[in-house]
Amino acid sequence: MLSMKRRGAARLAAAVVASGLVAAGAIATAGTAAADDTTPTHGGATATLGGLKTFDQAVVHNDGGDQRVGAGLFEMAVDNGGTLQTYCIDIHNPTQQQAKYQEVPWSASSLHNNGDAGKIRWILQNSYPQVNDLAALASKAGAGNLTEKTAAAGTQVAIWRFSDHVKVDAVDPAAEKLADYLEKSAQNLGEPKASLTLDPPAVSGKSGSKLGPVTVHTNADSVTISPAAGAPAGVKIVGKDGKPVTSAAEGTQLFFDVPKGAADGSTSLTAQAATKVPVGRAFTGIGEHAKSQTQILAGSSESTVSAAATVSWKKQGAIPAITAEKNCAKGGVDVTAANKGDEAFRFQLSGKDYEIAPGKSQTVTVPVAEDQPYNITIKGEGGFKKSFSGVLDCKTAGSGGGKPSSKPSPASVGGSTGGDKGGDLAETGSSNATPMIAGIAVVLVVVGGGAVFFLRKKKTGTA
């Protein structure tokens, strides 16, 4: 196992200092002319794909013939420190070289409508690398002798049978017996919780009060809370008791304490922790790598995870907080506008007019085609403007009849195959340095005014 505890605190401290996070995917703004373009995010781990590292061969049986593919464990380097191991859950879609990934809930991935998603999690928890006693694993499966490569291949094959529902066999007989055992034994388990999220990621309200709450959800023992650099004087991050907060844990409620008479403005906070990402969390490509093969977590070292939340305040008038997140079940992006002001918030979204009364919120689901780049813009009174961009990737490529990739990882086919002697992550000896990904170059298509919307209305919680 990679021992990260001695370096975890140092990594986290460095990450807090280095991080210039703005709450991507959420904005709360009091300005009369705010314009931002963000990608919906969920918080948690972000990482760069290093390639297929521990693998053997498998054969996919298609109507057009058989195709041999690599099957096994991928490796990712976590931003600001940490290493992840993952399996593929999108066999027909290749990975992209040095693709950037983010941790997401199943609802924002191809698992959203997969009734076998829980069986995949069972396989992950009951096979390699979580089970690293290969002799014991082989005995259970009646597989003879297993190596790290064949154990990884058999595990991947079993996962594909549930993630993509394809006919696929491992080439190695022992790996095939392991795959059959895992497939027959798998039970449906629940979705694992996120490593770190903040809910909601944007709040708003009148100055002279505590604005929030923003609730911390995490599996980490402790989370470091940091205000944005250059936060307005007098604005504090506090708990329910009104005392300043610099650390938090699961369930902690955070508030932005804005002094009375403060000039209209906005700021944000960053939450960061060092923890192991739960096995079974989904990872999807982001930015220019949004269409890269979807992955699912098999093992994690202690890794840096983060989330952010924004706040805005005014003395009077409409005070909106806007958030967006993918909704794979409805095939679109949920845009939620909450208004904590004393006047209605009026805005346009894709050619339609909306009005949110004080103390209310409304969610609009904007339909987006699968694999379609989108640029969704909200325009409000006084020059208010907010845009969300990305690519909707909610289905396995097999849904469109694509052929499986013979090279699941063009980035790196090969590498080390280390063994884990007692924990979550097989030792790979990878570097913690994470390559920086250059800017996003995606052609964005504005969602037109002719789109159909699904609406939900609800009261916002009290501050």
Predicted features, each with a name:
Residues 2-6, 404-444, 460-463:
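Extracellular Ser/Thr-rich, low-complexity/disordered mucin-like segments
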Residues 167-319:
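Acidic/charged, solvent-exposed loop-and-adjacent secondary-structure segments enriched in E/D, K/R, S/T
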Residues 29, 221, 265, 341-343:
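Short loop/turn segments at connectors of secondary-structure elements within structured domains
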Residues 261, 276-423:
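Membrane-proximal extracellular "stem/stalk" segments
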Residues 337-359, 427-463:
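Conserved, compact domain cores that house catalytic/ligand-binding motifs in diverse enzymes
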Residues 36-166, 172-188:
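Short, surface-exposed polybasic-aromatic patches that bind anionic ligands, especially phosphate groups
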Residues 64-68, 81, 203-207, 248, ...:
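Short, ordered beta-strand-loop transition motifs
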Residues 1-36, 435-459:
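Secretory targeting and sorting signals
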